[in-house]
Amino acid sequence: MGWKSLAVGTCIALIGGCTSTIPEQPAAVDPHWLLSGSAIFGEPVAPSELPEDDILGLAPEMREYLANVAPDARPQQRLAALLKGFEQRDFTVEYRADQTLTAAETYRQKVGNCMAFTVMMVAMARELGADAYFNQVEVPPVWGHDEEQTFVVYRHINMVSESNRGRRVVDFNLAAYDPVYDQRELTDNEAFAQYYSNRGLEWMAQGEMREAFRYLRKSLELRPGNSDLWANLGAFYSRNGRNTAAEQSYLQALQLDSRHTIAMSNLERLYRQQQQFELADYYAEKARFHRERNPYYLYYQARNAYEHGDFKSAKRQLKRAIWQYENDHRFHFLMGLTSYRLGDYENSKTYFTEAFSLVDNPATERAYSRKLDYLMKRP
C-alpha cells in the first residue's frame, strides 16, 4: 500500500488553507531582483560572470585510461570492466562531502562527494559507449545548515546505465543504496543545476560570497522552477543579512512547492529573529503539520529516540510511520528492534519477518542478519 493518509491529509491541508490565513501578507516576490544580486552587491551581476564549468569534460589522461578498458568488448562489458577495476582499487575516489567537482577534477584529485563521483561516472560510461544518465533517489533531502542554523538542501544522485540485460546502478556507497526509494531520471540540465547549487553552497561556507552567488544564480538559470534551488538562494541571502531577499527567496520556493518544509522552517527562523512572532508561529505550525505527516520524518524521529534509549517514544513514532507507509523495510526492522527492547518478543519477531520480506537488496539482508546475531548474543 502507498501513502494511506494522502487523501485525508490533502483535505485537511485545503481546509486549513481556508481557515488559517497568513497574519500579514508579505510583499510580492520579485524573482528578477533576487537573481540580479543587487540586494547584496549594490548592482546587478552580469550574465557574462556566470560560470560555465565543463562538468562532463574528459581530461586527456581519462581518455587514455578508458582506452585501455576492455577495448575490444561491447559498451556494457567495458563498463562492467571499469567498475570491476574500481572494486579492485585500480582507481579510487575518497569521499569528501564538501567537494562537488567536475568529472576531470574528480579524476585528477581522486576526491569528491556523490555528485562529483556520479558526474565522473556518467562521463566515463558515455565515453565507453554505454548509455548512462543521472538518477535522483527520492530519499528525504539532506538538510545541512550554516552557522546561523539556516537549512539548505542537498539531494542524493547516482548513475544508472540500462541495456537489454537490465539496469545497472552505480552509487558512491552502493552497499547503502536501497531501491525501496522512488527514483527518477534527471536530464543533464537538471543534474547540472544541482551541481551548481552544491558548489555555490560550498563557496558560501568558505566565505566567498560573490562566487557563491554566481553558482547559485547559474543553478536557477538552468532550473528556475526548482523550489530547492530557491530555498538555497534564500539561505545565501540570510547568511549575508539580506533579510528581505531571503524572505522573498523562501516565498518563491513555497509558490513552486507549497509543502516545502525547509523553506517554511527558514521563514520561521527569519521572522523569529525579526521578532515577527505571529508570522514565525504560522510557518512553524505549517512545517510541523507537513513533517508529522511525512513517514520518513517520523522514522528519523523514531531512530533518534531509539538511539537515546527512549523506546516508548520510538514505538509511537514508528506506529504512525507504518500506518502512513507500510512498504519500507527499515520501518519494520526498527519496530522489531524497539519491540525487542521493550520485551515484546512476539511482536518483534513479526516485525523482523515483515522487514525481511520487503528487502530485495542482498547487502541489506546481510546487514540485518548481522544486527540480529549481535542482538541475540547480548546478555
Predicted regions and their residues:
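TPR alpha-solenoid repeat register
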Residues: L229, A263, Y297, F331, ...
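Canonical tetratricopeptide repeat
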Residues: N198, N232, N266, Y300-Q301, ...
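Terminal, low-structured helical/coil segments at or just beyond the last alpha-helical repeat
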Residues: F333-P379
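Conserved structural position within tetratricopeptide repeats
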Residues: L220-E221, L251-Q255, E285-F289, K319-W323, ...
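Long, contiguous interaction/recruitment modules in multidomain scaffold/adaptor proteins
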Residues: E94-W230, A235, R239-N240, T244-S258
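Secondary-structure boundary elements
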Residues: P44-A104
